[in-house]
Amino acid sequence: MGAGASAEEKHSRELEKKLKEDAEKDARTVKLLLLGAGESGKSTIVKQMKIIHQDGYSLEECLEFIAIIYGNTLQSILAIVRAMTTLNIQYGDSARQDDARKLMHMADTIEEGTMPKEMSDIIQRLWKDSGIQACFERASEYQLNDSAGYYLSDLERLVTPGYVPTEQDVLRSRVKTTGIIETQFSFKDLNFRMFDVGGQRSERKKWIHCFEGVTCIIFIAALSAYDMVLVEDDEVNRMHESLHLFNSICNHRYFATTSIVLFLNKKDVFFEKIKKAHLSICFPDYDGPNTYEDAGNYIKVQFLELNMRRDVKEIYSHMTCATDTQNVKFVFDAVTDIIIKENLKDCGLF
């Protein structure tokens, strides 16, 4: 009888210990939801977490990006070539017109993700053309990957035999996120589960079941989107869409107690763009100086003023460049400190 009771006690103690361990583990688990409109930079942040908090990209993994990088490069030059027609821009050298036709034909016949020498030669000739450059300058008038200039101006390196993509090449690559991608890593004694959710409108209905028990939402908005329209609706300004989405998330009943951090991303692209295109394109009421600081601050205020519970809920914001590892490292460190302060003070661990 006594032996049975002590075995029961032992079992009970073990169970109690396990429950305590589980509770501690749960308290140390941070669920992070990355939200934002399409092409705002969510997946680039995920890649940075792999570089900063995991072991980065192995040689094999880097090599897997070659096909994506070649595909991105080809799609970018094709988008510019098509825009030459729609924007009625003339080639600087009429011989490039034949190159463009040849490229269109080749694009339909080559194996996807490859870059034959004849094709890379044509692309390099086209990229040097003054008409193509003029068209590239007007990229906000059609859909063009942010990485277009990065890859096209460095194509010679990308097609060198034995080419291995660098971390920056990998970070710049673009694949549309469909569904939900989870990344796990540890940092500052916490276990992070980060969920990247497709941003295009068709993807948004998949978000809902991710909402439960989320510790923190990182909402990503592209600063540089102020003069651009959506891929899925060319009547809607991308910045307006982003504000609309942020409004619905930061005031959602699901997130009453969730920490929200705003990443105003692509600050590098915005820095260059604001010199040429006035912010009033997006915000007709804006009459302040068209500088990086003033215009950037105005955009930040537009987002933060949507928070209906400003008196009790603070939304933290950061200007970010998702392709800059040091910048992301610094900002994520600050975000983690916010999470520790806001969400873990109640559990007695910190």
Swiss-Prot record:
Residues 7-21 have a biased composition (Basic and acidic residues). The modification ADP-ribosylcysteine is found at C347. One of its GO terms (biological process) is background adaptation. GO terms for molecular function: acyl binding; G protein-coupled receptor binding; G-protein beta/gamma-subunit complex binding; GDP binding; GTP binding; GTPase activity; metal ion binding; protein kinase binding. Residues 28-350 form the G-alpha domain. A lipid is attached at G2 (N-myristoyl glycine). Rod photoreceptor cells. Predominantly expressed in the retina followed by the ciliary body, iris and retinal pigment epithelium. InterPro entries: Gprotein_alpha_I (IPR001408), Gprotein_alpha_su (IPR001019), GproteinA_insert (IPR011025), P-loop_NTPase (IPR027417). PANTHER family: GTP-BINDING PROTEIN ALPHA SUBUNIT, GUANINE NUCLEOTIDE-BINDING PROTEIN G(T) SUBUNIT ALPHA-1. Functions as a signal transducer for the rod photoreceptor RHO. Required for normal RHO-mediated light perception by the retina. Guanine nucleotide-binding proteins (G proteins) function as transducers downstream of G protein-coupled receptors (GPCRs), such as the photoreceptor RHO. The alpha chain contains the guanine nucleotide binding site and alternates between an active, GTP-bound state and an inactive, GDP-bound state. Activated RHO promotes GDP release and GTP binding. Signaling is mediated via downstream effector proteins, such as cGMP-phosphodiesterase. This is Guanine nucleotide-binding protein G(t) subunit alpha-1. It comes from Homo sapiens. The lineage of its organism: Eukaryota, Metazoa, Chordata, Craniata, Vertebrata.
